[in-house]
Amino acid sequence: SLAPWTVEIHNGADDNASGTAGILELGWRLLRRQSENRRAILLIAFSGEEMGLLGSEYYCKNPLVPLDSTIAMVNLDMVGRLSTHGRVEVYGVDTAQEFRPSLSNFARSLSIQTEFHPEGYGPSDHATFHQRNIPVLHFFTGLHKDYHRPSDDFDKVDTDGLSKICDLVELAVWQLATNPDRPKPTSPGTSLSLVG
């Protein structure tokens, strides 16, 4: 907590109920289109991120499917404040050759402002996969004054913005799930996983 003087509940609406809600929404959307998939899509909500990526590390050591069959990891962490910052940050866009041009086209078609970051490192669960040379994308709407405080409540979540981000992520995941080719990793590594 960044408010250690209080015993108030920290609901974590943006960090990271927004990401969990995004996963559930994407699961519903992708389920309706699953007959077109070439690959399985795993929806995973990890725990222990704040304590050192414990959940994603455990998964990578005990995967449901072999990690060499995992073609990408897409992470939604703090995606509930699009209206606050006016853009979604996407990390890992250069971890596979296809990511940057595809996401640019998708964002343009949806009129979503983006800020791209090439690296796949960072303090969230995607980093665990990137360390294992799996291409990653991490969607994030930025830090704010409610981060890790009791004031991170639902009334501050931009639900329309979260829906737009889900539109963008859906296009990216759908391309990964239906493209016959695996993404081509561009840099070695030092929740949503796609298998195929």
What are these regions (language model features)?
Residues F46-H144, D158, L162:
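Metal-dependent peptidase/peptidase-like ectodomains
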Residues S1-L53, V169:
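Alpha-helical metal-binding/catalytic segments enriched in His/Glu/Asp
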Residues N179-G196:
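PDZ/PDZ-like peptide-tail recognition elements
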Residues E25-S35, K61-V65, S104-I112, E170-D181:
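Sec-exported extracytoplasmic/periplasmic mature domains
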Residues G22, S102, K164, L168:
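Charged catalytic carboxylate motif
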Residues A3-G12, H85-V88, P150, F154:
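Glycine- and acidic
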Residues N133-R182:
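Extended, hydrophobic interaction surfaces within ordered domains
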